[in-house]
Structures are given as structure tokens and as C-alpha cells.
Amino acid sequence: MLAVLGVIVAAVIVIALSIWLGKSRKRDLDRAMGKVAPDNKKTRDAKAAADARLAAEAEEAKAATAAEPAKSAESAKAEPAPAAQAEPEPAAAPKPESQPASKPTPAKPETPESVGSRLTRLKAKLAKSGNPFGKALFDILAKDNLSEADWEDVEDTLLLADVGADASAQLVDDLRTDARITGKADPAEVRATLKEKLLDLVGRDTDRRLNAEKPGAAKPSVIIMVGVNGTGKTTTAGKLARLFVAENKQVMMGAADTFRAAAADQLETWGARVNVPVVRSDKDGADPASVAFEASAKAKEANADVLIIDTAGRLQNKSNLMDELGKIRRVTEKNLPVDEVLLVLDATTGQNGMAQAKVFAEAIGITGVVLSKLDGSAKGGIVVSVQKELGVPVKLVGLGEGPDDLAPFDPEGFVDGILA
């Protein structure tokens, strides 16, 4: 709009200037001619030339005036429109000063129960377990002048308690020749005699110490846990770690049961409760021997007192089981000697567990037995039969679901419990 007004003003000025120049030149011409209009040819020619020059100048001014709006329009078209002024962005709210992330406070490790306290508590627990084995024997043997039928009842009671055929026959023979039993029965004498005979059968003088606790034990002392899935093997491994922690030993565990998805997690949970590190694979189905090898290398590097290695308990293929356990032992012994192989047996399975026990004994060779769930079994005679069949002692027993319900096997406490 301003450009158009400028063009109009310029045109008016040019026209006014042209008129003024025309009048001025006319005055000059009149002055030169003495204001007398000469009537000769020369004067007429000069006037015509002046008029022509004035007309030409007027045409030039008109042409310039007409060209000016077009030029203005072109420049207006060429000139970019002024950019709209961007509204300033609102200032960002000041960020709060970053505070360092608070680390979760690690749970305080539990303090396991001492071994002495366990033994006292577990003896009482066994006495209250209601095992009918000892009571049934005592009720028969407390009779006066036992008949042949009574002796058959004694043998049947022993067999039902899973003492085993050979051990049952041996005990009956010993009792038959004891004057305290065959004559007029004194209940106190009968009880004392029965306790003595059962202790002999269980093995009162058998060395039941774990090899890791013996003088001159290797350090780290390696314990391999074997057993059928479902016997409480992994749980027993965790409880055994607590037992060693209670004795102020530095413990490490290896999760070589890589075929049961929850086994490594379960072992880690047990380890975390007493601050025991667990070596495991991040991949399900990994080679168990590689886990055992890594665990033994790390235990050696850390100079741990004890390394407990949990293994798989699949019995679907005896050949594969033997190969797997044999390989675990061989690769572990490249780093550390294996001091102990503990077989975990469920006491409630009775004689059915004996076939399983023999498979593991053949596969890897065992040095001791852990009887789990002994409190839930009326078949306490498994202690006798497993020792007689395998030729190795029962070293540990489990009497409950509590984390400290695992203790060294005490023959006298066991016999007292079943005769209570």
C-alpha cells in the first residue's frame, strides 16, 4: 500500500515539474522575442521545436510514471513476507538436583543354630514323633516266657520297620539267647536289653563325622550331594551349608543340578540366608560338569573351608546318570580332591529307597548317607538296613522342615527316641 502511494506522489511531482518547465521556457522565449509574437517562419520553427521537445519530455515522464507501479509490484512480489516472530518457548522448569539412588539394605544373614542345641532339640523331637517301631517291640518282649509266635511277631515288627531281613534275623537270634529276655520278664531289664541290641545293630562306635571335620581334611573340602529328585537333596545341601556356617566355616556351593529349572534358584535362596555364595550357570540345561569345575576353581581361589556341589537326580537312564556323576567327579578333581559323596534318602520310602541307593553307589561311590524326613516315618529301621546294604554310615538326619532341622546322626539319641 505504501509503495502505491509513493508511485502516485512521484507521478504528481513529475507532471507539475513538466508544466513548470514548460511555462518557464515559454517565458524565456517571450522575453527573447520581446513579448511580441513574431510572425515569421524562423520564429514559428523555433516554437514548434520547443513544443516538440516539451511533448517528448512529457511522454518520457508519463512512461516513467507508468513503469513505476509495475516495478514496485515486482519488488513487492520478490520481497519475502516478514517472518512471523516466533513466540519464545516457556523456560523449562529447573530440574531437581539428582539424589544418589539409595541402595537397598542387604538382609542381615541369619545365625544358624549351634550343633549342640540341634542335637538336644532333635532328640526330643524324635522321642515325640510317635514311631511305633520300638514300642511294638517292647510290648512283645515284656511278656513272660515268650512263645514261638511271639518271636515271629518280633521278626515281623522288625521287617515292617524296614530293618531288613538279614538284620532282623540277626537281632532275633541275639534276643533269643539273652536270659534277660527268655525268662520271667522284667520291663526295665527288657528295655535295657533291647536298647543295647539295637545300638549294636545301628553301630554305636561307627565314625560318623563328615570328612571335612576330621583333622587334616583338605581345604577346601569338597562334598558332592547325590540322590533322587524329591528326596530333599537341594534343601539338604542348603541346610548342610548352615550347619558348617554354625561352626564358623567359610562355605561355597555349586548348583550343578542344571536340569531342574528351580534347583539353582532354590540353592541361591538358601545361600543368601547365611551369606554363602553360589556358583551357577545362567542357562538352563548347561553342562553340570562345567558348573562343578567352575565352582571348584572359585572355592580354591577363595580358600573356602567347604564346597558343597548339588547334582541332578534323574534315574530314567542309569547309564547317563553314571556318566554324568562320574564326569562331575573327574572334572572337580582337576582342581580339588573330592572328600565326601553324600547320598540323600527319603526315610519314608523305606526299602524302596534301597534300589535307588545302590544305583548311586555304583555310579559315583558314596561315603555317607543323609536320611531326610525321618520324623515322618514309622520305618526307622531304614537306618539299620541302609548301613548294612551299602556299608557306609548314616551321617546326618533331617527331622523337620525348619532350616536348622538337620543334625549329625546320634545312634543313642535315635534308639532312645524309638523306645520312648
Swiss-Prot record:
Q: Which reaction does it catalyse?
A: GTP + H2O = GDP + phosphate + H(+)
In this chain, the stretch annotated as Disordered covers 28-118
Chief localization class?
A: membrane
Pfam families per the record?
Answer: SRP54 (PF00448), SRP54_N (PF02881)
Binding locations of GTP: 227-234, 310-314, 372-375
Biased-composition ranges, Basic and acidic residues, are 28-62
- Membrane topology reported for the UniProt record: Peripheral membrane protein
GO annotations under biological process? SRP-dependent cotranslational protein targeting to membrane
Its domain of life reads Bacteria
Q: Which UniProt keywords apply?
A: Cell membrane, Cytoplasm, GTP-binding, Hydrolase, Membrane, Nucleotide-binding, Receptor
Point to the regions of Low complexity compositional bias.
Answer: 63-104
Asked if Membrane is a keyword of the record, the answer is yes
Instruction: Provide the E.C. number(s) assigned to this enzyme.
Output: 3.6.5.4
Q: GO molecular function terms here?
A: ATP hydrolysis activity; GTP binding; GTPase activity; signal recognition particle binding
| Recorded GO CC terms | cytoplasm; plasma membrane
Task: Keyword check for Cytoplasm, yes or no.
Answer: yes
Task: Tell me which Gene3D superfamilies the record gives.
Answer: P-loop containing nucleotide triphosphate hydrolases, Signal recognition particle SRP54, nucleotide-binding domain
Q: Describe its function.
A: Involved in targeting and insertion of nascent membrane proteins into the cytoplasmic membrane. Acts as a receptor for the complex formed by the signal recognition particle (SRP) and the ribosome-nascent chain (RNC).
Q: How does it assemble?
A: Part of the signal recognition particle protein translocation system, which is composed of SRP and FtsY.
PANTHER family tied to this protein? SIGNAL RECOGNITION PARTICLE RECEPTOR SUBUNIT ALPHA
Family under the similarity heading: Belongs to the GTP-binding SRP family. FtsY subfamily.
Q: What is this protein called?
A: Signal recognition particle receptor FtsY
Name the encoding gene, please.
ftsY
